C-alpha cells in the first residue's frame, strides 16, 4: 500500500514539473497547430478562381479578424521584391496583422508600440530570436515616425506597411516618406461613413478614450483613400469586420484579379461595437454613430474644423444599404 502511495505521489510531482514545459509550448505559438491550419487555408486560397472581393480569402490565425488570409493572398499574387514589413500599434504582438507573415513566410519586420511593457514582452518571446524581427518602443508622432522607420535599415520599397494606432493614423500616414510599401493596410473608423472626409484633429499625445468617447478616433475611409491616391495607391477594399482598408501601389494593381473600387463600393460598416450607453450596454447600428454626434473633426479636403453630423452619415449609409441593422 505504501509503495503504491509513493508511486502515485511521484507521478503527480512529475506532472507538476512538466507545467513550465507545457507553458513554454503554449506561449511559443509559432509551434501551434493553428499555424498549420493557416498554411493549409493559404494554400487552398491559391487555387481559388475569380476572386473579386477580399472577403473571399479571409482567415484568421493571429490577426484580430480575417486579415491573415487577405495578406497571404496578396503576397502570393504580387511579385513583391523585398519581403519586409513595418507595423505599428501592435501592443504585445500576440494579435497582429504581420505575426503570421513573420512565422509562416519568414519576412523581416519592424514593430513599434508605445508601451515598454509590451515591447519587453515581444523581446522575451522565442520568435524574437527565431525570426528577423525588430521591436521598438516609442509613442509615434509626426516628428519621429520617419526616424523610427529609418532605424530599421530597410530598402525604400518594403512589402507591407500596417498602420493601426487608434488615433492619429491619417496624420502619421501622411507624414511617412522614407518608405514606399507595395501594400498599405490602414485602420479606418467606419462611424464616419464613406462620403465624409473626416479625421480627428492631430494631437501629439492623443490617447483614445481620454478626452472623447472611445469610439472617436482615426479617420474616415474617404480621407484614407484620398491620401493614399496622392501617394500613388489604389483602394481595393476592406476586411469584413469593417476596420482595415487595403491599398496597393499602382504599379502592382495589374497583378490582381480584383479592381480598384470607390469608397462607396469598398466601404464596410464595422461589425463590432466600441461604444456603450450609461449602463454599459453595447450600442449597435445607428446608435454607434450617434455616440460621436457633433464632436470636432478636420475636413481633410478643406483643412477646416467641422462637427460630426450623425444623422447625415446615417442617412447616407441607409441609402447605400451599408448598414446591417439600424
Region locations from a protein language model:
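Short, structured coil segments at secondary-structure junctions
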Residues: 104-105, 179-180, 231
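N-terminal auxiliary segments of SAM/dcSAM-dependent transferases
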Residues: 7-43
Amino acid at each position: 500500500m505504501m509503495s503504491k502511495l509513493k508511486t502515485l505521489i511521484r507521478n503527480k510531482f512529475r506532472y507538476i514539473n512538466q507545467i513550465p514545459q507545457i507553458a513554454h509550448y503554449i506561449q511559443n505559438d509559432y509551434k501551434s497547430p493553428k499555424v498549420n491550419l493557416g498554411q493549409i487555408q493559404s494554400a487552398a486560397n491559391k487555387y481559388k478562381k475569380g476572386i473579386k472581393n477580399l472577403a473571399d480569402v479571409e482567415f484568421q490565425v493571429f490577426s484580430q479578424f480575417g486579415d491573415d488570409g487577405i495578406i497571404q493572398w496578396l503576397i502570393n499574387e504580387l511579385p513583391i521584391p523585398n519581403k519586409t514589413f513595418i507595423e505599428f500599434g501592435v501592443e504585445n504582438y500576440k494579435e497582429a496583422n504581420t505575426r503570421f507573415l513573420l512565422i509562416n513566410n519568414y519576412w523581416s519586420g519592424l514593430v513599434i508600440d508605445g508601451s515598454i511593457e509590451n515591447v519587453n514582452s515581444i523581446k522575451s518571446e522565442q520568435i524574437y530570436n527565431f525570426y528577423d524581427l525588430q521591436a521598438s518602443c516609442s509613442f509615434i508622432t509626426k516628428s519621429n515616425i520617419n526616424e523610427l522607420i529609418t532605424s530599421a535599415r530597410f530598402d525604400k520599397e518594403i512589402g507591407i506597411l500596417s498602420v493601426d494606432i487608434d488615433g492619429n493614423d491619417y496624420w502619421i500616414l501622411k507624414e511617412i516618406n522614407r518608405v514606399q510599401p507595395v501594400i498599405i493596410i490602414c485602420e479606418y473608423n467606419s462611424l464616419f461613413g464613406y462620403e465624409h472626409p473626416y479625421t480627428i484633429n492631430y494631437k501629439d499625445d492623443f490617447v483614445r478614450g481620454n478626452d472623447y468617447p472611445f469610439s472617436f478616433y482615426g479617420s474616415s475611409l474617404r480621407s484614407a483613400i484620398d491620401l493614399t491616391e496622392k501617394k500613388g495607391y489604389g483602394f481595393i477594399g476592406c476586411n469584413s469586420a469593417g476596420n482595415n482598408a487595403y491599398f496597393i501601389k499602382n504599379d502592382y494593381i495589374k497583378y490582381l484579379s480584383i479592381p480598384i473600387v470607390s469608397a462607396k463600393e469598398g466601404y464596410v460598416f464595422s461589425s463590432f461595437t466600441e461604444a456603450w450607453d450609461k449602463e454599459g450596454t453595447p450600442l449597435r447600428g445607428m446608435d454607434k454613430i450617434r455616440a460621436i454626434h457633433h464632436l470636432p473633426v478636420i475636413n481633410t479636403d478643406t483643412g477646416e474644423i467641422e462637427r460630426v453630423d450623425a444623422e447625415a452619415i446615417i442617412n447616407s449609409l441607409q441609402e447605400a444599404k451599408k448598414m446591417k441593422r439600424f
